[in-house]
Amino acid sequence: MKKLKSALVKCMGPLYNVLFKTRIENRRLIKEMKQLTAEKEYLNYQVNYLKHHFDIGQMKPATGVLREYQLAEVEFARYILDLLKPYEIPMYLEGGALLGAKRHKGFIPWDDDIDIAMSRADFNKLLHVFKTDSNFVWIDTTQKSGYYAEYYDKLIRANANKNVVIMTPTCVHVFNGTCLRDSKNLEFFPNDFLKEEVTEEQYLAFRDKAIAFIRVPHTWKELFDFYEATWKECGLFSLEPTSRIVPGLGNWDLTEYGYHGFRHHDDVYPTTTILFEGKKLPCPNKAEAILDREYSKSWRDYPKDIGFPLTLDDKNKYFEMIGEPLINYKEF
């Protein structure tokens, strides 16, 4: 019996040592976790304290590379809009650009693009201008292949320092630069007038079916053909003004944003102008009403994505993929 007990102790000794060390390590990890939790709560309190006492509209503009990019973007936007001025196409700031104009008198400090929207009839007119005006280089994107950022990069390089128009399934880009890295970009989006007799239920049923088709992988040509055929066949939309406006087929908002109700014609038209980084840009008639509907009253408060410029992040994903240096837009 003594020999058996001795053998068991001898065999179990290493296991006891492991268990003892594990217990000590677990205690250390628990202590560290408590410290990290306390630090997180402390930082959360500090952030919430600043948010409570600091008006986001008074936030300083971006600095460094991001600020340089923003100012180049607004100069480019004004340049393109001046080229389009003779065509008298009513258009207006959309999305984050409109929010930035109202809340910051320019860019949201961490934003990096400018979105412009217009009615379907005006969007069709804009496409005709892009195809026929010698100030622009229209690209046939129906045969697009490959990763979208690589595709943009190739087309910009092939048309260096020209206003390259690239129609995608979610917007129309106008790029200018020598490559994607140094290019400026302005984006245009179509909105549609909804016929007066169409009910909200009918529109939402159409919207769900359209989104279901769009989110399944398709070639760009298949999507363009779907937009054209569906717009004509559904019978929901009007080229003439009506009292209600919705994101159009070919508008990023249709698939990526939730439904927030209809926009009212009088909230959008007649369009006006607003100061954006010291430049006059086109604006909806009642910008705050538009923003209240799109974002609720929370557009005046702090969002969840603070600090991250999405366009530059997208570019960096491409540069990482091809082994090029990333754009360091961080300010500190």
Locations of the language-model features?
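Conserved catalytic core of two-metal-ion nucleotidyltransferases
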Residues: A62-K85, L127-Y295, R300-F332
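Boundary detector for helix-to-coil junctions that initiate low-complexity/charged tails
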Residues: M1-Q46, H53
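Active-site nucleotide-donor binding segment shared across nucleotidyl transfer reactions
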Residues: L81-I114, M118
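Tryptophan-centered motif/residue detector
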Residues: F54-D55, Y92, W110, T170-H173, ...
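Helix N-cap motif at beta-to-alpha junctions
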Residues: R120-F123
